Amino acid sequence: MPQVSMRDMLSAGVHFGHQTRYWNPKMGKYIFGARNKIHIINLEHTVPAFNEALNLITQMAAQKKKILFVGTKRAAQKTIKEQAERAGQPFVSHRWLGGMLTNYKTIRASIRRLSDLTTQSQDGTFAKLTKKEALMRSRDMEKLERSIGGIKGMGGLPDAMFVIDVEHERIAIQEANKLGIPVIGVVDTNSSPEGIDYVIPGNDDAIRAIKLYATAIADACLEGSKSSASVPNKDEYVAAEDGAAE
């Protein structure tokens, strides 16, 4: 199973929190101390918490469950998109649209619209339209791709959500909480761990730290999917037994 060591975290700067004046007292138990007015996160908490989350993700992926990657702030966007795509998992990296989970029926209609427009752009429909109409549909498609393209293949609500910067993604977390979807969240010293089922105390701003988290989560997804592919499902067992009986 994928594991991340304390050395990995130290080299990625996971232990650097925010300036001490911005701290959230609810994160007190995860803080080791302060250096140059910057809180230092106690990695003795972070390492086991993150590895527990990785084990959970591996097990979920082995059961073909969907993990939604969420990171819409600039420092996280590129990495979240790349790693979720690598793992074959849904993601939101542009902007969280209110109701993305709690009003999924409406979102599903937008996904259908995006699918229709994509088909039209490929089957020659756009070429038959006026230049203005084709441009309008093309822009509509690009806008939808940017906002919901990462979840177009989700096929329903996710089974868990992985979040970078829980303060920035508070609306997404509230929606997940309302629906009972477990949340794995990277929580910095200025944030509240409330509503987070699996708290990963750590730096949520440094690109190297964000890469470390997202890459490890993606690796766990791939590890789980691989083990799932190597285990025959129930129907295959039945077929094999029937064949042997004959």
UniProtKB/Swiss-Prot annotation:
Classification via Pfam families: Ribosomal_S2 (PF00318)
GO cellular component: cytosolic small ribosomal subunit
Keyword Ribosomal protein: yes
Gene Ontology MF annotations: structural constituent of ribosome
Record has Ribosomal protein as a keyword: yes
Coiled coil (residue ranges): none
GO biological-process terms attached to the record: translation
Keywords, comma-separated and alphabetical: Ribonucleoprotein, Ribosomal protein
Highest taxon of source: Bacteria
Transmembrane domains' residue ranges: none
Region (Disordered): 225-246
Xref: PANTHER family: 30S RIBOSOMAL PROTEIN S2 PROKARYOTIC AND ORGANELLAR (PTHR12534), SMALL RIBOSOMAL SUBUNIT PROTEIN US2M (PTHR12534:SF0)
Family the UniProt entry places it in: Belongs to the universal ribosomal protein uS2 family.
Record-linked HAMAP family: Ribosomal_uS2_B
Name of the protein in its database record: Small ribosomal subunit protein uS2
UniProt organism field: Cellvibrio japonicus (strain Ueda107) (Pseudomonas fluorescens subsp. cellulosa)
